[in-house]
Regions:
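Short, mixed-charge aromatic SLiMs
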Residues: 89-93, 120-126, 173-179
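Glycine- and charge-enriched loop/helix tracts that form the active or gating conduit
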Residues: 1-67, 71-89, 93-106
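General structural feature for long, well-ordered alpha-helical segments within catalytic domains
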Residues: 11, 48, 67, 111, ...
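Histidine/acidic-rich helix-loop-helix segments that form or flank divalent-metal centers
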Residues: 36-46, 50-54, 107-165
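Charged substrate- and nucleic-acid-binding regions of tRNA-handling and nucleotidyl-transfer enzymes
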Residues: 99-104, 158-179
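A ubiquitous short alpha-helical element
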Residues: 82-86, 138, 179
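A glycine-rich phosphate-binding loop feature that marks nucleotide/adenosyl-phosphate handling sites
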Residues: 17-19, 30-34, 70, 114-122, ...
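Feature representing long, continuous alpha-helical segments
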Residues: 66-69, 92, 96, 100, ...
């Protein structure tokens, strides 16, 4: 956790390269080894995860969320006829994995609950209109909703530039509707 909330969460790559994650978090190794042939991604799942962790503030819940947000992708990877990779259902599986791993590592229930909810909803489509923002606020609560906006921003920034401006503008509109 100290590494995750440090100024250098990217050092997770060193833990992977030296074989440490293979022992303490083997699920991370599978992420590092899973490529994403998709216009929205430049990096393997693991490198995308590292970049996403670097995009959020040094907060335990946010960094853990980014660590786990795509952990289900290796198990959900499919490739279509055009050679494009898809990961349908990965958010739900990632949330389940996050809960199991955080429990295994003896995290407190509050952290487990927040991280699991954020991971499960990180790809949730929220239309920037009052009706849909209210619905998301009711479903998630204000604290999780605001954290989710940070998670979504970090996720976009760690992807390719494909539609990045459009995605970021939508997040700005979501925040404006909320405020």
């Amino acid at each position: 956790v100290k590494l995750l909330v440090s100024d250098h969460p990217g050092h997770m790559k060193i833990l992977y390269e030296t074989g440490i994650t293979k022992v303490i978090l083997p699920e991370f190794d599978r992420m590092m080894e899973t490529e994403q042939n998709n216009p929205h991604h430049l990096y393997s799942v693991g490198m995308h995860t590292i970049r996403a962790m670097e995009e959020v503030p040094a907060d335990k819940v946010l960094r853990l969320t980014m660590l786990f947000h795509d952990m289900g992708k290796p198990a959900k990877k499919t490739t279509d006829a055009e050679g494009i990779d898809h990961f349908h259902g990965h958010a739900e599986l990632s949330a389940k994995m996050a809960k199991e791993i955080l429990q295994r590592l003896k995290f407190d229930n509050d952290t487990i609950g927040k991280v699991t909810k954020l991971v499960k909803n990180h790809d949730r489509k929220i239309i920037p209109h009052a009706k849909y923002v209210r619905r998301a606020l009711c479903d998630l609560g204000e604290e999780i909703f605001l954290l989710l906006l940070e998670v979504k921003h970090a996720d976009v920034m760690a992807q390719s530039t494909c539609r990045r401006e459009e995605k970021l503008e939508e997040l700005v509109r979501l925040r404006e509707v909320y405020e």
